[in-house]
Every structure is written in structure tokens, then in C-alpha cells.
Curated annotation (Swiss-Prot):
HAMAP family (alphabetical): RNase_T
Domain Exonuclease: from-to ranges: 24-198
One Pfam match: RNase_T
Subunit structure: Homodimer.
Named cofactor requirement(s): Mg(2+)
Gene behind this protein: rnt
Function: Trims short 3' overhangs of a variety of RNA species, leaving a one or two nucleotide 3' overhang. Responsible for the end-turnover of tRNA: specifically removes the terminal AMP residue from uncharged tRNA (tRNA-C-C-A). Also appears to be involved in tRNA biosynthesis.
Protein name in UniProt: Ribonuclease T
Organism this protein belongs to: Pasteurella multocida (strain Pm70)
GO CC annotations on file: cytosol
Cofactor, free-text remark: Binds two Mg(2+) per subunit. The active form of the enzyme binds two Mg(2+) ions in its active site. The first Mg(2+) forms only one salt bridge with the protein.
Residues binding Mg(2+) 2: 27, 29, 185, 190
């Protein structure tokens, strides 16, 4: 086997695990459900890497409290739910432009280091998080968006398939990942737990022999 062939079959390389996609775990906290009109208030992201044993582990983190964009709708019920005080100066909130620029910069650098072709959002009920991230990217006009425009890995779906649980706290409990309900609905905390959950599911499938996939006749 040549060196090129060996690399092409090396499942310890992240670029070979998801067909060249680079997973980035995301969570957002918002002032409503409409990504076009409601404020994005908090954003966290965690990249992943393969360790020397070929197991997926969390890597780099970025986290921002975000100022509502001009004219944004603020739903009081949403603020009551996530506990965010948008007028608290200790939030250290930045503009959407700063947050999206720094996020894209971190992701592009990590994606390049992993030799992947495109990044893909991983989130719990991912369509929600993706819609707010993409809306913010469009509003700010930040260029070189590394994320696939519509593809995503939804850990609610994946954990439903693997554990029969779709709620984040229940899925974490099934995976024996500690979850503090008092810290839930912090974008950073939820991203950290979602990253652990995603890595656990990917690694557990590998331990069970489900990846790399082999057809029945290939095992003979």
C-alpha cells in the first residue's frame, strides 16, 4: 500500500469521517423564534478534532454575548425563558459583525488545519440555530462563510435514533454525561454538552463496529 492509499483509508483523520465536512457545534440564545426579525443574543461554538486514538473530542471554543441588531424584535417571554438581561452592562455584548467575523475566522482556520473542504453545523434542533446564524451572516455581510448553506447534523435526531431520547438533558443522561439544569439555556453550557453528546455518539458507533461501515459480504 502506498502512502497516499494509506492516508485515503486512515479513519483516524477527521477529513475522512464526514466526507470532507468539518463539524462545528453551535448553540444560540435569542429573543424569539423568527431569525429574520428577532434578536440574536448569545452565540457559542466548539470545533472538534480526532485524537491519536481516532476518537472525536472537543477542541476550540468561542463565545459571545451579542447586542440586538438595529430594529430587532425583543420578545419578553423569550428573555424570561433564557434569563438574559439585555441591559446588563456586565454582559460584555459585542455587535453581530464582531461575533460572526470571529466565529468564521476560528472555523476557517480549524477547517483548513483538518484539511476539510467545508464546515457543517452541529446543533440540538439544528434548524433553529442554523437559521439564526445564517440570518446574522446575511445581515452583517461578513464574507467567506465556511458553513454549508443548508446541510447540518441535528443531535436531537441522532440521539433519538441512538437512545430514543430527543431532549438534550435526557440524551445526555442516556450517554452518562452530567447535565446541570440550572445552567441550561446558556449558549456556552449547552454547546459544551452538545459537543460532548455528539462526540460520544460518533465514538460509540465506532466502538460498536459501525464505522467504518462494512457490507456483510466484505466481512467474510
Amino acid at each position: 500500500m502506498t502512502e497516499i492509499q494509506a492516508e485515503a483509508t486512515n479513519t483516524h483523520l477527521l477529513k475522512h469521517r464526514f466526507r470532507g465536512y468539518f463539524p462545528v457545534i453551535i448553540d444560540v440564545e435569542t429573543a424569539g423564534f423568527n431569525a429574520k426579525t428577532d434578536a440574536l443574543l448569545e452565540l457559542a461554538a466548539i470545533t472538534v478534532k480526532m485524537n491519536e486514538d481516532g476518537l472525536l473530542v472537543p477542541d476550540q471554543t468561542c463565545h459571545f454575548h451579542i447586542e440586538p441588531f438595529a430594529g430587532a424584535n425583543i420578545n419578553p417571554e423569550s428573555l424570561q425563558f433564557n434569563g438574559i438581561d439585555i441591559h446588563n452592562p456586565l454582559r460584555g455584548a459585542v455587535s453581530e459583525t464582531v461575533a460572526i467575523t470571529e466565529l468564521f475566522k476560528m472555523v476557517r482556520k480549524a477547517q483548513k488545519a483538518a484539511d476539510c473542504q467545508r464546515s457543517i453545523i452541529v446543533a440540538h434542533n439544528a434548524a433553529f440555530d442554523q437559521s439564526f446564524l445564517m440570518a446574522a451572516a446575511e445581515r452583517t455581510g461578513v464574507k467567506r462563510n465556511p458553513f454549508h448553506p443548508f446541510g447540518m447534523f441535528d443531535t436531537a435526531t441522532l440521539s433519538g435514533f441512538m437512545f430514543g431520547q430527543t431532549v438534550l438533558v435526557k440524551a445526555c443522561q442516556a450517554a452518562q454525561i452530567a447535565f446541570d439544569g440550572k445552567q441550561a439555556h446558556s449558549a456556552l453550557y449547552d454547546t459544551e454538552r452538545t459537543a460532548e453528546l455528539f462526540c460520544y455518539m460518533v465514538n460509540h458507533l465506532k466502538h460498536l463496529g459501525g464505522f467504518p461501515h462494512q457490507q456483510a459480504n466484505e466481512k467474510k
